Amino acid sequence: MKLNKTILYLFLGSALTVSSLSCSDYLDTEPITERPVPLSDKPYTTAAEAESLMDAIYSNFANEYWQLDYFFNGDAQADTCYTGGDNPQNMQQGEYRIIATNTNVSRDWNDLYGFINSCNKVLNYVDNISDPTLTAARKKEMKAEASIMRALYYFHAVQLWGDVPLVTKAVIGVNSANFNEVYNQVYPKRATTAEVYALIISDLEGALADAPASSNKFKASKGAALAILAKVYATKPSPDYTKVVSYTDQLATQGYSLMSNYDHLFDGAHEGNAEAIFEANGNAGSIWAWSTFMFIGTDWKKFNTPSNDVVKAFNDEGDTVRKQSSVTFESVSWADNYWASSAYPFMNKQRITDGTQNFYVARYADLLLIRAEAKVQLGDYTGAAALVNQVRARVGLSPITITSKDDGINKILKERKLELAFEGERWFDLKRTGKAVEILSTRKDGNGNVLSFAHNINANKLLWPIPQSQIDNNPNLTQNTGY
């Protein structure tokens, strides 16, 4: 067997020049291949190099995946947003006719595995650094943070594609002695969904003892690990709702609380607030928050246009507080089949335009509702309703009651739709609760007509195709059903 010199690694990065991005060329950039480089067992030798590896993990929040795709995937594939813009790759995705050569799909695969590789560098090599200024305690903390982040990225990947390769070693150089090991890295097989979730849980549970304190809102903290664990146990095949309750019990001891003013979550003046569990810290530097320009503004047709459905949901509920914080209407120079140019809606949760916009990876209201979902599944309808009503009381809405499992799931889904609109959650909520095909196949326009593309959704479309470019390069990868 001969290993081609030009092997394309699974670990790919992507480059983006924000200043040159327009709605027509969004997502059309090609990834940059990370080539093999010789590495010893001690490629990093100083505390400064170790801290640089950690900085790289967090600076990934400036990447296109986090600044744009995460929100597009979670809302434009659901009933809270239309695709917006004019990019055909986006239209495929938002209309449930995605194909294996879609560049959004390949870029997100490359980005997620690139992020995982950044985590693996810390996990593989930080223990070998002998610099005395890098303490044993700091090494443990670094590894805990990297483990939480790796788990988060595998959690995203397994929800998007199902079975995915499990790679736990950083890219290494190729030589005759390590050929078989490198071959398995370069040409990995897909692990089962159960195996992926096992690694995710192991990473998160193993990180709890050494993770930064939950008061560190901008780091992968103990609270972040608890929050992700709760979501993982609610989402994995054969969910463990007792575990969800247990981890949200622990989360409740970490000092989090709901902000009394909903808009303070998004106004830029209350960063690292009491409700924030894990917050990406836009700083106009290493994390330049450019997503705002993709979602709001009248200079060109933006992405993630709020849907008639979500605006109607706010109106029907009398939810003026969250509607005003979530959606803003402007006069624009264009019109489409959904909205008139005189009152065109934009997402309003990301509204800071100086590069310092933050966003939430996890916040407490989200986890209260995940806990409520678990309570419903366990038959505690009164306890579930009490949790939902905490969230509703914050915005002046009357309490609900829950009478059955289906009633509870439907009411919690509606509450999550209103509370977490445009935060990248809806697609995954619908999948997790088994409601995606039922709800998305009946999506309607502002006149009550079922959207022409709604019939495209089916069970196969709930997972993305494995990127064709990866299959072409890797004989061990198989395609998802229906692609």
Q: Residues of each region from the PLM?
A:
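Flexible, polar/acidic helix-loop-strand segments at domain edges
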Residues: 97, 170, 312-363
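TPR-repeat structural position
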Residues: 197, 239-241, 381
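Sec-dependent bacterial lipoprotein signal peptides
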Residues: 1-21
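Conserved, well-structured interaction surfaces
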Residues: 46-55, 59-60, 87-161, 186-195, ...
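Membrane-proximal, proline-rich intrinsically disordered regions
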Residues: 3, 23-72, 453-483
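Short, surface-exposed recognition loops and adjoining beta-strand edges that mediate ligand/DNA contacts
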Residues: 67-90, 164-175, 212-294, 399-407, ...
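Short, solvent-exposed loop/beta-turn-alpha elements that line the ligand-binding surface or hinge
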Residues: 80, 85-108, 128, 176-188, ...
